[in-house]
Structures are given as structure tokens and as C-alpha cells.
Design a protein with these regions (language model features):
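Hydrophobic/aromatic-rich alpha-helical bundle segments in the mid-to-C-terminal region
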Residues: 129-178
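Short amphipathic alpha-helical elements of helix-turn-helix/winged-helix folds
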Residues: 3-7, 86, 149
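Hydrophobic/aromatic residues within well-ordered alpha-helical segments
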Residues: 39, 46, 50, 54, ...
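Hydrophobic alpha-helical connector segments
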Residues: 45, 58-93, 142-146
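Helix-turn-helix
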Residues: 3, 7-41, 45-49
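Amphipathic alpha-helical packing segments from all-alpha helical-bundle domains
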Residues: 55, 74, 89, 95, ...
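An amphipathic alpha-helix signature
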Residues: 1, 73, 77, 81, ...
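Amphipathic alpha-helical segments used for helix-helix packing
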Residues: 75-78, 86-108, 155-160
């Protein structure tokens, strides 16, 4: 799978051949087909593996930052900053973005798998609402608002300006301001 990931990143889904993947992995083409069936299935396995690493990272951030009893503003800010400073710069995230941004002909992850980090955050927001920490009759919408005001805006800033680092004050200010806007709406 490492060989396939490297070639899908370097060549794109369309141009990466099973022959080239097999050669890079130092196995026969038949071995690749025996293990994965077809190139599309191999591509999806690569994307799923990278997605799994992202899910673990987001789950850890949720479990360690959005803890019961912690000041909500501090918790949300710490969570947003952790995702922006640790997940965005990670090679797993960069790989995931590059693989999933490929042409429409590349196989897509199932929506349920692709949206797993968002669902985990929605579940935590449902707990926050049930505990009275936020006023959110629709925790799914609240999680989307939070993400849009913080993580998505920070990602846009990082994507728009390649010279901006995840830990720079500009990026961290986006998170803090987004948390404050979110709390004004949901507290």
C-alpha cells in the first residue's frame, strides 16, 4: 500500500498503473490484483488508511480537549488549535487532501467514512447540549457552525497563503475569534 500511495500522489489516480505499483512494491502485478482486485479498490484502501489516521487524530483531540468540566471557551479553543496545528500540517492530512482532491474519475470514499470526523464532533456537541453547556437544538448544525467559524476558516487561510504556518498568530486568531462567535450564538 505504501507503493500505491506514493504513486497515486505522484502520478494521480488515472496515470498510476498497476504495473508501476507492482514494480515499486517489488511484487508481481498478479499479487496486487490478488490482494486488492482492481486499481479502484487499491486506491480506496489507500484513502481509507489515511482517513483512519485522521480519524484517530480528531478522536484524540475531541477526547482530550473537549472534556467534561473544562471551561467551554478554553476547551473549544484548545480543540480548534490542536486540529489546526497538529492535524492540518500532518502528512496524513496533506496526503488525504491530495488523494481526495483528484479528478472525478478517482473512486470516492463512502460518505459515512469520509464524514466520520464531523460525526464525532456532532456527537460531542450533542453531549454538550444535553449537559446544558450550549443551546443547540440541532447539534449537527452547531458542529457545522463551529467547524465553519474555526477550522474551515483556518484551513482556507492556510490554503490561500502557502507562507502562513499553522502556528502563526493569524491562524490562531481565526480559531479564537471563531470560538467567540460560536459561543455568542450557542450559549
Amino acid at each position: 500500500m505504501d507503493a500505491a500511495e506514493a504513486l497515486f500522489l505522484a502520478e494521480g489516480y488515472e496515470r498510476a498503473s498497476v504495473d508501476a505499483i507492482a514494480a515499486r512494491a517489488q511484487v508481481s502485478k498478479r499479487t496486487v490484483y490478488d490482494h486488492f482486485g482492481e486499481k479502484a479498490a487499491l486506491f480506496l484502501r489507500v484513502v481509507e488508511r489515511v482517513n483512519d489516521a485522521l480519524v484517530r487524530s480528531v478522536r484524540a483531540a475531541i477526547e482530550e480537549e473537549l472534556t467534561p468540566g473544562r471551561d467551554l471557551r478554553d476547551a473549544l479553543t484548545a480543540f480548534g488549535r490542536r486540529v489546526v496545528t497538529q492535524t492540518f500540517p500532518s502528512s496524513d492530512y496533506i496526503t488525504f487532501r491530495r488523494l481526495t482532491a483528484q479528478q472525478w474519475s478517482a473512486p470516492r470514499l463512502a460518505e459515512a467514512v469520509r464524514d466520520q470526523p464531523e460525526r464525532m464532533l456532532e456527537e460531542r456537541f450533542a453531549v454538550l447540549a444535553a449537559d446544558g453547556e450550549i443551546r443547540a437544538p440541532d447539534p449537527v448544525l452547531a458542529a457545522r457552525h463551529f467547524t465553519a467559524l474555526t477550522i474551515s476558516l483556518a484551513l482556507d487561510a492556510l490554503d490561500d497563503r502557502r507562507d502562513v504556518e499553522a502556528e502563526e498568530p493569524e491562524t490562531l486568531t481565526i480559531i479564537t475569534d471563531g470560538v467567540d462567535a460560536f459561543l455568542r450564538a450557542y450559549r
